[in-house]
């Protein structure tokens, strides 16, 4: 295996092309190179990238959407996230990142409630009032608290509902839930 240095922009592009968790940079590059013919790569690839950049910059809504997806995928392939051993730590990290990506949509989406419980609140007392054994924890970098005494599948379901309400695509939501 050879090591090469790439600039930050290229690294983020490669990371954004990830199709499944655990896919290596070599796999991603190989797949991207196989999609293009050799003559396309030699001459026209840089020109195409520049043209796409201009088109994307005219549509700010789509650009923001792409950035949200890139941010989530970057989190999933990050060394820090991979190093987290406990599901609760991955769960809280995902929630924190979702808030950073779109705090307004996150705030609106936290209205998610269970049959008998409140999952999210802006203070610990509200969560304790909804159940004595909720074990509320603060979501770092946000004004929110979340219940944590649920099993991993319930945590995944909470993230799924949250991301769905935030407008994320189903396939990305599935990847995030599987990573928790």
Curated annotation (Swiss-Prot):
Q: Where is the signal peptide?
A: none
> Matching InterPro entries, A to Z?
Arc_rbn_hlx_hlx, Ribbon_hlx_hlx, SeqA, SeqA_DNA-bd_C, SeqA_DNA-bd_C_sf, SeqA_N
Q: What is its main location?
A: cytoplasm
Sorted alphabetically, which keywords does the UniProt record give?
A: Cytoplasm, DNA replication inhibitor, DNA-binding
Which Pfam families does this UniProt record tie to the protein? Answer: SeqA, SeqA_N
Q: Which Gene3D superfamilies match?
A: Met repressor-like, Replication modulator SeqA, C-terminal DNA-binding domain
Map out region (Interaction with DNA) in residue numbers: 115-119
A GO molecular function term, named singly, is: DNA binding
Q: Where in the cell is it found?
A: Cytoplasm
Source taxon at top rank: Bacteria
Entry-linked SUPFAM superfamilies: Replication modulator SeqA, C-terminal DNA-binding domain (SSF82808), Ribbon-helix-helix (SSF47598)
GO CC annotation terms, alphabetical: cytoplasm
GO aspect biological process, one term: negative regulation of DNA-templated DNA replication initiation
Family of this protein: Belongs to the SeqA family.
Task: Sum up the protein's function in the record's words.
Answer: Negative regulator of replication initiation, which contributes to regulation of DNA replication and ensures that replication initiation occurs exactly once per chromosome per cell cycle. Binds to pairs of hemimethylated GATC sequences in the oriC region, thus preventing assembly of replication proteins and re-initiation at newly replicated origins. Repression is relieved when the region becomes fully methylated.
- SUBUNIT field: Homodimer. Polymerizes to form helical filaments.
Q: What is this protein called?
A: Negative modulator of initiation of replication
Protein's organism: Aliivibrio fischeri (strain ATCC 700601 / ES114) (Vibrio fischeri)
**Which gene is this protein's source?**
seqA
